[in-house]
Design a protein with these regions (language model features):
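Acidic/His- and Gly-rich active-site-bordering loop/insert found
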Residues: 2-103
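A short beta-alpha structural unit
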Residues: 17-21, 263-265, 299-311, 347-351, ...
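Active-site metal-coordination/substrate-binding segment of hydrolases
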Residues: 65-141, 145-147, 152-163, 185, ...
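Short, conserved charged micro-motifs
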Residues: 67, 270-279, 369-375
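Fold-level recognition of mixed alpha/beta catalytic cores in primary-metabolism enzymes, strongest
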Residues: 134-227, 235-239
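Acidic-enriched catalytic cores of C-N bond-cleaving enzymes acting on peptides and small amides
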Residues: 179, 196-201, 220-250, 270-345, ...
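Non-catalytic terminal/interface segments that mediate subunit docking, oligomerization
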Residues: 326, 330-393
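Single conserved hydrophobic/aromatic residue that forms the stacking wall/gate
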Residues: 412-421
């Protein structure tokens, strides 16, 4: 704790640390909402919670600055609750365990919640600071952003008013976001009748873990491996060359997180077991080479398990594995006018197969509506050809960059001395 509290600026990091101690996964925000309301009361600013679960602060202008434009500071209170498989953590009740690792602040075995805890911490620092000179300030801390922006969608017209809105859900210090991708969820489902396994076969549990994962919007262009896509590559080969059958598949656990772990159970003829085990080792080495310096913690293992009674039928298995193998994933293209910025991408987030049911979830993002639709249509075609029922949901529009925005030009002018220093 002491390490984090000593980081600069201390008035922001102290609030971020306090946020790590309040459970706040999407859908379970009662504790953080109560905490933020109490903070606002103690800071002496008007504070209330609206019907959508958003927290709003209003701070009057410094005397003499009442005629300045009203600035709205916006962030979201919820976090993505993702953990390593071996980590024991209850996101609804347990505090996070943050620590300093070199130049980074991390959490032990879980996501850190800096998205968007740092934005909320910055708002808290501004709200309690009595030395700042400012015009009228409004803070909007939204609920359940990570699962569908429900707080933002539920905000009623007239609840807040202002002239300039600054979104604090960004990544790097000294950088400004001047656009934002829209998004849409795609869910493909299928029910099937299981078939009995061959009693002469051997069952193997194949586990992929140790990947970096990450946020499927911010980090989609960082080259991180997708556990579901790697597993599809493995299965494609052992089905073709080792007569493998598929019993179950469980990969990823959050729609907006790049999957870092995946586990399948397969059966193979006894004569193929050693070949499959050797191929597992080969795959790990190939992937270590492909993702050198990126996925240094990758682990791909297999172990014998008891033979399950049932499995996925051959035709269904082939269709599912082929669709997941072929599904577009990662960056589609960058913004033509801002070449280093991702415009359109998708994340093959979760795969669940077993017990007569299959479900695949993909989240597509783009700052251009036509490209978002193009990408999702390609993905939908993939799974439709596999006989799956595909539903799109939760769509929201993107925000195309305006490099001539007056607010942007003002911020560039203000930050010029800092950037030159």
């Amino acid at each position: 704790m002491s390490e984090i509290l000593s980081l600069a600026p201390q008035n922001v990091w102290k609030h971020f640390y306090s946020l790590t101690q309040i459970p706040r996964p999407s859908g379970h925000l009662e504790k953080i909402q109560a905490f933020l309301l109490e903070f606002g009361k103690n800071a002496g600013v008007e504070s209330f919670q609206d019907e959508a679960g958003n927290i709003i602060y209003r701070k009057p202008a410094t005397p003499g600055m009442e005629d300045c434009k009203t600035v709205i500071l916006q962030a979201h209170m919820d976090m993505v609750p993702q953990k390593n498989k071996e980590t024991v953590h209850d996101f609804v009740n347990d505090p996070l365990q943050p620590y300093v690792d070199g130049e980074w602040v991390k959490a032990k075995g879980t996501t850190l919640g800096s998205d968007n805890g740092m934005g909320v911490a910055a708002i808290m620092a501004v709200m309690e600071d009595k030395t700042l000179k400012h015009g009228p300030l409004v803070a909007l801390i939204t609920a359940d952003e990570e699962t569908g922006m429900y707080g933002a969608f539920g905000l009623k017209p007239g609840t807040i008013e202002g002239d300039i809105l600054l979104n604090l859900d960004s990544e790097d210090e000294g950088e400004l976001y001047i656009g934002c991708a829209g998004g849409e969820d795609l869910t493909a489902t299928l029910e099937y009748k299981e078939e009995p396994t061959d009693p002469e076969d051997v069952a193997l549990k194949v586990t992929l873990k140790g990947l970096r994962g990450g946020h499927s919007g911010i980090q989609i262009g960082w080259g991180h491996a997708n556990a579901n896509k790697l597993m599809a590559r493995f299965l494609n080969q052992v089905i073709t060359y080792d007569e493998a059958c598929l019993v179950s598949w469980e990969g990823g656990n959050m729609r907006n997180a790049i999957p870092r772990e995946c586990e399948v159970v397969i059966t193979v003829p006894a004569t193929e077991v050693e070949d499959v085990l050797a191929f597992v080792g080969e795959c790990e080495q190939v992937w270590r080479d492909e993702f050198a310096t990126i996925e240094e913690g990758i682990s791909f293992t297999a172990e014998r398990v008891d033979l399950p009674a049932t499995m996925v039928p051959e035709e269904i298995r082939d269709n599912l594995v082929d669709a997941i193998f072929a599904c577009p994933n990662g960056v589609e293209r960058f913004i033509p006018t801002i070449p280093d910025t991702v415009e359109t991408s998708s994340n093959l987030a979760t795969v669940e197969i077993g017990g007569g049911k299959a479900a695949v979830k993909v989240l597509t993002r783009s700052s251009r509506e036509s490209m978002k639709d193009y990408r999702n249509t390609a993905i939908e075609s993939c799974f439709s050809m596999a006989g799956m029922h595909v539903v799109r949901s939760g769509g929201y529009s993107g925000w195309e960059p305006n490099v001539n925005s007056p607010i942007l030009l003002s911020l560039i002018h203000i930050s010029e001395p800092t950037r030159q220093a």
